[in-house]
């Protein structure tokens, strides 16, 4: 696969093929999201890491006016507890809602976010696709 084809595939993963986070969040109501989790998978942090890797780029792509903070904590001690949470922030900087991401799959974290945040699903005609359309599917 050529470099251009790889880039198109990557861009479409962010904009077109990752469906669940294709939402529009009201930037007047929320200022952003803050994710806090550890760099390693132990103690139930794998779902948070996959959410960050797979879903956060799409959320950022379609909500460019929102701020997304990711706090990754280095923790080598499996006995030490590290927060694993997603916080929805107001414009005053206060936390509106908190989602505990520990021991959850990334899809469940995204569904919890959709339940707690006011949003509108992105209309099909507003989904951005790049390159030949047959290569996206």
UniProtKB/Swiss-Prot annotation:
Matching Pfam families: L51_S25_CI-B8
GO annotation terms (biological process): mitochondrial translation
UniProt-listed InterPro entries: Ribosomal_mL43/mS25/NADH_DH, Ribosomal_mS25/mL61
Compartments where located: Mitochondrion
Domain of life from the UniProt record: Eukaryota
Alphabetic keyword roster: Mitochondrion, Ribonucleoprotein, Ribosomal protein
GO cellular component, one term: mitochondrial large ribosomal subunit
GO molecular-function term, one example from the UniProt record: structural constituent of ribosome
Functional summary from the UniProt entry: Component of the mitochondrial ribosome (mitoribosome), a dedicated translation machinery responsible for the synthesis of mitochondrial genome-encoded proteins, including at least some of the essential transmembrane subunits of the mitochondrial respiratory chain. The mitoribosomes are attached to the mitochondrial inner membrane and translation products are cotranslationally integrated into the membrane. mL61 is not essential in cells grown at 30 degrees Celsius but is required for mitochondrial translation in cells grown at 18 degrees Celsius.
Subunit structure: Component of the mitochondrial large ribosomal subunit (mt-LSU). Mature yeast 74S mitochondrial ribosomes consist of a small (37S) and a large (54S) subunit. The 37S small subunit contains a 15S ribosomal RNA (15S mt-rRNA) and 34 different proteins. The 54S large subunit contains a 21S rRNA (21S mt-rRNA) and 46 different proteins.
Family: Belongs to the mitochondrion-specific ribosomal protein mL61 family.
Protein name: Large ribosomal subunit protein mL61
Organism: Saccharomyces cerevisiae (strain ATCC 204508 / S288c) (Baker's yeast)
Gene: MRP49
């Amino acid at each position: 696969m050529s470099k251009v084809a790889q880039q198109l595939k990557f861009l479409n993963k962010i904009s077109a093929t990752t469906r669940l986070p294709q939402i529009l969040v009201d930037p007047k109501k929320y200022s952003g999201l803050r994710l806090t989790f550890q760099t390693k998978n132990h103690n139930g942090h794998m779902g948070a890491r996959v959410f960050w890797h797979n879903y956060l780029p799409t959320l950022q792509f379609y909500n460019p006016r929102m701020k997304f903070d990711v706090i990754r904590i280095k923790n080598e001690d499996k006995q030490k507890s590290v927060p694993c949470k997603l916080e929805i922030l107001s414009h005053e900087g206060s936390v509106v809602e908190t989602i505990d991401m520990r021991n959850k799959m990334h899809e469940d974290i995204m569904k919890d976010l959709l339940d707690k945040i006011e949003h509108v699903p992105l209309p099909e005609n507003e989904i951005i696709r790049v390159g030949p359309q047959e290569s996206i599917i």
